[in-house]
């Protein structure tokens, strides 16, 4: 049946869970947004996720209970999923589909953009080489985040990655560009407790004033979880490349996103790949992660921190494995450090930032930054090896230098890694690093230059650097 304004499709042949199968609808485009109406006049939203000569498959955004094959009808709303964007989105909270959930009126859109974005010309990409300060010593010194980079956080079930995400969102800045820095925060599959945590944390700390929040709940439809990061990235690209903002996009938890991808793939009866995930998951993740970057001739930038919880702490699981192939390093949240009460429990040894060298050093952070990072890494690794030795032989078998390395490892965890909720500048972080390194003999600081040792060696540890949680 055709009305004056829209065409309706009435031949709904099959309903399976959240999926609707509509016959003779081959002119519907993949990704189109539709409206489903039942016999009582109630409407639901949906998206076309598959089109063939015989039928179109529609993922319903709400429950399908109450839909009847005889009375259900489908009509086209938009040819592709779009989001109305505006600078007024800063300071607002939205659900996973971009609808306001803060009690304020809808945003008056300046543009309506395709949430799949526009491909970024590789030749137009600029080299990422400007340091982003997160205020977290282990990240800023050892695995530095660079503007335009995509640097994931690998966590595990029960670890405080939500608290870490909130701390980064609160503290992150590009030194010298504080006025045009914004955070776009997208959370997928949240429990009610987590929704309350993020809402209260952003409001309590004032971070909401420069942030845009997209919060998808665990009881929302799976397809909404697939749209949420695209809504966030579309907003980020608009703020960055239309208004010149340096935007940090935090996506959590990408494991929930991938499980929604698997759920929908199963409902469509697709042939599964590794551990039941669809074979195209790599391509799908790349379509999100590759939207980070700096474009030549445009002042803004998009930087990404995807956060994922590794099932069974398995870094070879398909989700962290494929994420690692696409992104430029990883920050690893450690269960052992968390068990000691250390926050944030980031282990620098398996962590890596492949673009760190581009954005640190003289004229960017400090001339000794890279060498201090290398020396901390080497000394901490030595201290951990000695801990294993002590567990077997006891401390009597150690030399005096070995005992200093053991104490270094303890101080490194207590003062440098375990900063609690402190917001440290990179200068503060390097000062703490030198204070801990000064416990070692100068002869052991083989990765530091003589000039740097003469200038900074001898700094004293201050108890105020032992982090506490607010």
UniProtKB/Swiss-Prot annotation:
UniProt KW keywords: ATP synthesis, Hydrogen ion transport, Ion transport, Transport
SUPFAM superfamilies associated with the record: C-terminal domain of alpha and beta subunits of F1 ATP synthase, P-loop containing nucleoside triphosphate hydrolases
Pfam families: ATP-synt_ab, ATP-synt_ab_N, ATP-synt_VA_C
Function summary: Produces ATP from ADP in the presence of a proton gradient across the membrane. The V-type beta chain is a regulatory subunit.
Name listed for the protein in its UniProt record: V-type ATP synthase beta chain
Keyword flag Transport: yes
Listed GO biological process terms: proton motive force-driven plasma membrane ATP synthesis
Taxonomic lineage of the native organism: Bacteria, Thermotogati, Deinococcota, Deinococci, Deinococcales
GO MF entry, a single one: proton-transporting ATP synthase activity, rotational mechanism
Coiled coil: none
Gene name of this polypeptide: atpB
């Amino acid at each position: 049946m055709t009305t004056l304004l829209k065409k309706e499709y009435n031949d709904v042949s099959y309903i399976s869970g959240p999926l609707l199968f509509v016959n003779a609808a081959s002119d519907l485009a993949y990704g189109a947004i539709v409206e489903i109406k039942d016999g009582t006049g109630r409407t639901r939203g949906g998206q076309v996720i598959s089109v063939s000569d015989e039928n179109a498959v529609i993922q319903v955004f709400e429950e399908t209970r109450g839909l009847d094959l005889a009375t259900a009808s489908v009509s086209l709303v938009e040819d592709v999923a779009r989001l109305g964007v505006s600078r007024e989105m800063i300071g607002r909270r939205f659900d996973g589909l971009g609808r306001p959930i803060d009690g304020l009126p809808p945003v008056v859109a300046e543009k309506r953009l395709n949430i799949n974005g526009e491909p970024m010309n590789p030749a137009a990409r600029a080299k990422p080489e400007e340091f982003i300060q997160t205020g977290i010593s282990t990240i800023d010194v050892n695995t530095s985040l660079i503007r335009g980079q995509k640097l994931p956080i690998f966590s595990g079930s029960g670890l405080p990655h939500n608290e870490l995400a909130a701390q980064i969102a609160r503290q992150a800045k590009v030194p010298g560009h504080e006025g045009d820095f914004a955070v776009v925060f997208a959370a997928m599959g949240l429990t009610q407790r987590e929704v309350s945590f993020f809402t209260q944390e952003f409001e309590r700390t004032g971070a909401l004033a420069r942030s845009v929040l997209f919060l998808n709940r665990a009881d929302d439809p799976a397809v909404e979880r697939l749209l949420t990061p695209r809504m966030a990235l579309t907003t980020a690209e608009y703020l960055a490349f239309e208004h010149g903002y340096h935007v940090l996009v935090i996506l959590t938890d990408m494991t929930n996103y991938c499980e929604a991808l698997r759920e929908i793939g199963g409902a469509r009866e697709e042939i599964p790949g590794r551990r039941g995930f669809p074979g195209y998951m790599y391509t799908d993740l790349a379509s999100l992660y590759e939207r980070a970057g700096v474009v030549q001739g445009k002042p803004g930038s998009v930087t990404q921190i995807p956060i994922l919880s590794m099932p069974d702490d398995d870094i070879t699981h398909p989700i962290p494995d494929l994420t690692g192939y696409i992104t430029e390093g990883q920050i690893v949240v450690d269960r052992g450090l968390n068990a000691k009460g250390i926050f944030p429990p980031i282990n620098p040894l398996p962590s890596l930032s492949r673009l760190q060298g581009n954005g640190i050093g003289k004229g960017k952070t400090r001339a000794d930054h890279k060498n201090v990072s290398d020396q901390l890494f080497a000394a901490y690794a030595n201290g951990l090896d000695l801990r294993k030795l002590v567990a077997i032989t006891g401390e009597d078998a150690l030399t005096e230098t070995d005992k200093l390395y053991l104490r270094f490892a303890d101080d490194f965890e207590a003062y440098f890694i375990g900063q609690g909720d402190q917001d440290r500048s990179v200068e503060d972080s390097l000062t703490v690093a030198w204070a801990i390194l000064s416990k070692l003999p100068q002869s052991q600081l083989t990765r530091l230059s003589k000039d740097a040792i003469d200038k900074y060696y001898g700094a004293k540890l201050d108890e105020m650097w032992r982090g506490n949680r607010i």
